[in-house]
């Protein structure tokens, strides 16, 4: 029997605004003491009136444009009514009837994953369980700091066809968020949260299961694992001809399984109605266009430019554009070195051994000029590529000039041809049997003589010159 998963994602993106969605409390609350960034507005005290954040709208428009959405001039907030301990108002302010944007897409390996809608809303508080998992927790505390933090909710169409594709979609979305600067996209910190809806089609019998919602996936890896588990669980039911319950399930880290949480809610369960305290927000098209003009070059565009402008491969361009910081630093280095291919090689083989692509490159001790100086030393023959690799770490750690390190360590290449020739003559005099064997056809022994001189000079001899002189002395 053949089965195919059908997956749609609901993604909550915490926007990197200075203040919360509807009040002046700080939006960056991750490391604050519990319940220290709250006010009457974000905790829903009687008489407190919300005022929408302009920056929240700007960030939402940037995101919607980057995801190729139709951005609406007329938007309105609504109340989503439900009871939960981390929702002090008893409702969430969201955009249900008139969202910010609709009908977009994100390309993933040439395939369009359609975006149904993007709407703005406020976050709820956070429940702190006494154990790592809900099922094992004996008590739970409530931190209201996160109440009112602005969110953009992205709802995809069910175009995702595998758990792996779901993970890759989220990774690419996070990359775009970071390029735009609208969110950190850190799943581990709750800045990017994802719920998934999955059903499974039995292709042979043309039967599709009920949809199951999966929650509590706080890393890309867990999104993929949870969906793999759920795909296999639903498949087993279909194989047995059993009904799949329409429900919400949570990923349980301890058991590495999804567990049933509750029956799946429908929209009418939330009793949506217009938010009476906030009038409709109308943003003129001219204002929307001004905001869209601020969008930087996005990853796909940058990859194509790097391939054309710098002659890089798909792989090289893909790695070097992982983050906007890394891409910008690479281009600064290329301006100095005038050698994009060599710069790319050193980034991929050396620099990225010591840093994350998300590094704040302004803080690095190794500067673009150091790459140029290092390349000049190699091309002039003063140091070998192996020596350059040895001193790279010291340049990275100390910010010293490459030439300064070479002088301190006395590791400049020995390029004096007469000195190399004298050393080789002595080596050959001590190994006459190998000289004769070479002359009788064992040409592989050339490596022995070059190896001996490299050993005696501790790798400092110019290997190319040593090779040429050895051949001449051996009569070739």
Swiss-Prot record:
Question: What GO molecular-function term can you cite, just one?
Answer: ATP binding
Pfam families according to UniProt: GatB_N (PF02934), GatB_Yqey (PF02637)
Q: Does the keyword Protein biosynthesis apply?
A: yes
* Entries under InterPro entries matching the protein: Asn/Gln-tRNA_amidoTrfase_suB/E (IPR017959), Asn/Gln-tRNA_Trfase_suB/E_cat (IPR006075), Asn/Gln_amidotransferase (IPR018027), Asn/Gln_tRNA_amidoTrase-B-like (IPR003789), GatB (IPR004413), GatB_C_1 (IPR042114), GatB_Yqey_C_2 (IPR023168), Gln-tRNA_amidoTrfase_suB_CS (IPR017958)
Regarding protein family, the annotation reads:
Belongs to the GatB/GatE family. GatB subfamily.
**Chain's role:** Allows the formation of correctly charged Asn-tRNA(Asn) or Gln-tRNA(Gln) through the transamidation of misacylated Asp-tRNA(Asn) or Glu-tRNA(Gln) in organisms which lack either or both of asparaginyl-tRNA or glutaminyl-tRNA synthetases. The reaction takes place in the presence of glutamine and ATP through an activated phospho-Asp-tRNA(Asn) or phospho-Glu-tRNA(Gln).
User: What interactions and quaternary structure are annotated?
Assistant: Heterotrimer of A, B and C subunits.
- Record GO biological process: glutaminyl-tRNAGln biosynthesis via transamidation; translation
Q: Which domain of life is it from?
A: Bacteria
Name of the featured protein: Aspartyl/glutamyl-tRNA(Asn/Gln) amidotransferase subunit B
- Swiss-Prot/TrEMBL catalytic activity: L-glutamyl-tRNA(Gln) + L-glutamine + ATP + H2O = L-glutaminyl-tRNA(Gln) + L-glutamate + ADP + phosphate + H(+); L-aspartyl-tRNA(Asn) + L-glutamine + ATP + H2O = L-asparaginyl-tRNA(Asn) + L-glutamate + ADP + phosphate + 2 H(+)
EC main group:
ligase
Keywords of the record: ATP-binding, Ligase, Nucleotide-binding, Protein biosynthesis
Give the EC number. 6.3.5.-
Q: Does the keyword Nucleotide-binding apply?
A: yes
Primary gene name: gatB
